[in-house]
From Swiss-Prot:
Family: Belongs to the RNA methyltransferase TrmD family.
Chief location category: cytoplasm
Keywords: Cytoplasm, Methyltransferase, S-adenosyl-L-methionine, Transferase, tRNA processing
Gene: trmD
Lineage, opening ranks: Bacteria, Pseudomonadati, Campylobacterota, Epsilonproteobacteria, Campylobacterales
Protein name, entry field: tRNA (guanine-N(1)-)-methyltransferase
Length: 229
């Protein structure tokens, strides 16, 4: 699988892949990463990347011809995602679905975002990562890549670790407790559930499901109501 990131600030993207799981996955060629500087596709000799808004208003928007040129430079087949606050919220089911694609292109917004024609002409999907505003789409793109890459075979050392994670079964992950002895009196005042250490895997599984539902009801009542059974 390949990810292509189109951004005005490539230097914000690469450092995320210099450590840990995703670095190892790249080194093993489990996925490819391409980062393109949008300014390189500006028709302006000074590589101007933005324009004022028709009708007035504060801020600038990205040059739609620059975005178009950049997208044309990326080979097909590709699935193009624009990162924008106006997009639909990205969910775990989206990560699982997109992990089946061969090539995902992520276009990072800046300033006041995109000319609407860029979205109409270039986007297969538009996503946001929450109901808040960031200075650019790079963090959103990194979130999507991280979430999608976890579902690529071989990226995680233990594929089973995906099964019990939050949102995999529509509920938040059950509480976890370290298998260790601690000196801290405060930590020891809060014992882990005894059932966790008894070795009865069927009972542990049921307890974790029950705790998962309780945690979801407490932290994310919206999710709990959607999937209550």
């Amino acid at each position: 699988m390949k990810f292509s990131v189109l951004t005005l600030f490539p230097q914000l993207v690469w450092p995320y892949f210099e450590d840990s799981i995703l670095k190892r996955a790249l080194e093993k060629n489990l996925f490819e990463l391409e980062v393109l500087n949008l300014r390189d596709f500006s028709a302006n000799k000074y590589q101007k990347a933005d324009h004022t808004l028709i009708g007035g208003g504060a801020g600038q928007i990205l040059d739609p011809e620059m975005v178009e040129n950049a997208l044309h430079s990326v080979k097909n087949p590709k699935h193009t995602i624009f990162l924008s606050a106006v997009g639909k919220p990205f969910k775990q089911t989206d990560a699982m679905r997109l992990a089946q694609k061969k090539h995902v292109v992520l276009v990072c917004g800046r300033y006041e975002g995109f000319d609407e024609r860029s979205i109409e002409l270039g986007a297969d999907e538009v996503f946001c990562i929450g109901d808040f505003i960031l200075t650019g789409g790079e963090l959103g793109a990194l979130c999507l890549i991280d979430s999608i890459a976890r579902h690529i075979q071989g990226v995680l050392g233990n594929a089973q670790s995906l099964e019990n994670e939050s949102f995999e079964n529509h509920y938040l992950e059950a509480p976890n407790f370290a298998n260790a002895v601690f000196k801290s009196k405060e930590i020891n005042k809060i014992p882990a559930p005894l059932e966790y250490s008894k070795g009865n895997h069927a009972k542990i599984k049921q307890l974790k499901l029950d705790l998962s539902k309780l945690r979801t009801k407490f932290y994310r009542l919206d999710l709990f109501k959607q999937h209550k059974s």
